[in-house]
Amino acid sequence: MIEMKTFSAGWISEILLRNYVMGTIFFSLIHIPLYVSKSQGIKFKFNPNWPEKIQKLFTFNKQIFDNLFWSLFWGVPIWTAYEVISLWLYASGKIPFIQFSESPIYFFLILLLIPAFRDAHFYLVHRVLHFKFMYKIAHSVHHRNINPGPWSSLSMHPVEHLLYFSGVIIHWIILSNPLHAIYHLFHAGLGSANGHIGFKQMLLNDKHAIDLSNYNHYLHHKYFEVNYGNLMIPFDQWFGTYHDGSDELHQKMLVRFTKASN
């Protein structure tokens, strides 16, 4: 990490390239079989319709071009910026970090808690993004994707990217390790696919399939004002905004919407 004590184009460009390659491979491995070759048709697809060929709502009039633009032009660079700043802070000694050999139990504990912290951070940020002003200037870009696909995952306005990836700042505050910060950002960057793939499962063959997507978040894209969080911490159950697709909770949602409009 010695070279990371100062900002330089060399190591920064290496991290940016790595994130571009990893992100592109990851999302493409899901997108191509499901949305290009359509290897399983609409089997296990939440929305039986495919994205329209021409969609004036989207940048460049097409959902996939829109998603690629916001993800690659803004998403990956902002993800990388947070990683670069984190590594520079560690390498320059501006924040301390713990080695695995010093406290392996604490090291693993932080690693295990990152998904839970991300769940809480995502819920809080997501509620803020649904404030009228924030939705208008930023979050509306992401919510164009009523029928999301894998590349919709990081298709966000840069203001939303800044908030979405800001959870890594916790590692600037608590004692952790550069690997924790990197894992945290990968969990946010690649983990964003959960809930945006649009399919419950991907078929491997006639007998086997792998679970893919979070129906909970698909319903958020469909109804907007439900399921602000994920499922690890039940914030939506606690605050009355949960929807699981059942008729009972759908009716509760409609009643809530009616009250809010009066």
What does each model-found stretch correspond to?
Residues 1-129, 137-140, 145-166, 229-232, ...:
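Non-catalytic, topology-defining segments of multipass membrane proteins
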Residues 129, 172-175:
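Helix-capping/transition residues at the boundaries of transmembrane alpha-helices
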Residues 174-231, 238:
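Functionally important transmembrane alpha-helices
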